[in-house]
Amino acid sequence: MIDLRLLREDPDRVRASQRARGEDVALVDSLLSADERRRSSGVRFDELRAEQKGLGKLIGKAAGDEKAELLKRAEQLKTDVKAADAERDAADAETQELLQRLGNLVHPDVPVGGEEDFVTLETHGTHRDFAAEGFEPRDHLELGQLLGAIDVERGAKVSGSRFYFLTGVGALLELALVNAAIAQATAAGFTPMLTPALVRPQSMAGTGFLGQAAQDVYHLDKDDLYLVGTSEVPLAAYHMDEILDGDRLPLRYAGFSPCFRREAGSHGKDTRGIFRVHQFDKVEMFSYVLPEDSQAEHQRLLEWEKQWLTSLELPFRVIDVASADLGSSAARKYDCEAWIPTQGKYRELTSTSDCTEFQSRRLSIRVREGKKVRPLATLNGTLCAVPRTIVAILENHQQADGSVRVPEVLRPYLGGREVLEPVAK
């Protein structure tokens, strides 16, 4: 959530942010009104309580008619204090509810617009010219089937659409990717973590995934637990309700977890293969830093993502995501998109978001520096979303006979194997 003091001092900035997101600008005025009621009702409650306490002392010293009048006033005060308390609680609840609906403040350098209004910042690598090489590229599903690596038919039989099995070299390729990604993260100073896949509502809400993203989340009604769509959620909530020593920052975690997404708004999109699925594994980077260090940390996370994709020998570009395409918790977001030959376009493989103090305020995570305690900043970045990375590797490193060249960085994790060969029929 944002700082209420900032809202009071510069409401136009918050309105501009909401407008850039394509969200309800009127929410800002509703929140200002609720906050004013909360503050004024709090003042009234404090005044009545002070009078009530003072009256108790006077009653002890009074007698006769004076005491009777004071007792009458005390009875009225009891009613008034109760009403003021209820009014204060109601105004506070309304303020908190509206505050939870407000997105993070969009960074002023973020391009304004929707999904297609991003700005390309960098392009890396070159697209292969398959025509010059003399063959038509196969898509990742055809290649996966030739290699005995991907089985979507049995995935659908067992679990429904957008589920799959990774078999043989497909399973080995996932394990190689995960181990290589964790090795890179560990070398960069991240602490590896295996995180829970089920979290409580306060963890999901605290990271900003129960607002605009709620329809994409799986919920277990009987247990009131949520399946995470990313280990960002448990990694952010790891220090919930804690005060961290400033000398410990930055804290960097690399979480590995299964991820679950309903893909409710994706009907008809990417129905072939494993690019968009309901369950997948992912290595996620997460950082806790001082607020003034968040932009520099954001660049570091992006550099680590670029280093990873470069090590996989993939052509990719970096985009500055437009304002209306940001998640509610992100002030700024960069995506790295790999070139997918059979689609003839770049597709998202990684993303990194600077969430500033938004999540830490919601999760009550603070930092202590001497006698000063304040919210800190949180950031996240995908290192390896496994299925999409497999898609990019298969398509970009395929050879005419249906085999796939293994990027050098993965070979130590595949027993030195240099090529994935089609299985014998």
From Swiss-Prot:
Species assigned in the record: Streptomyces coelicolor (strain ATCC BAA-471 / A3(2) / M145)
Similarity comment text for this entry: Belongs to the class-II aminoacyl-tRNA synthetase family. Type-1 seryl-tRNA synthetase subfamily.
Keyword Ligase: yes
Positions bound to L-serine: T230, S231, E232, E284, T382
Family matches, as Gene3D superfamilies: Bira Bifunctional Protein, Domain 2 (3.30.930.10), Serine-tRNA synthetase, tRNA binding domain (1.10.287.40)
Name this polypeptide is given: Serine--tRNA ligase
Intracellular or extracellular location(s): Cytoplasm
HAMAP family referenced in this protein's UniProt entry, alphabetically: Ser_tRNA_synth_type1 (MF_00176)
UniProt: ATP binding residues: R261, R262, E263, V277, E348, L349, T350, S351
Taxonomic lineage: Bacteria, Bacillati, Actinomycetota, Actinomycetes, Kitasatosporales
Coiled-coil segments: none
Primary role: Catalyzes the attachment of serine to tRNA(Ser). Is also able to aminoacylate tRNA(Sec) with serine, to form the misacylated tRNA L-seryl-tRNA(Sec), which will be further converted into selenocysteinyl-tRNA(Sec).
Superkingdom as given in the UniProt entry: Bacteria
The protein's Enzyme Commission number: 6.1.1.11
Catalytic activity: tRNA(Ser) + L-serine + ATP = L-seryl-tRNA(Ser) + AMP + diphosphate + H(+); tRNA(Sec) + L-serine + ATP = L-seryl-tRNA(Sec) + AMP + diphosphate + H(+)
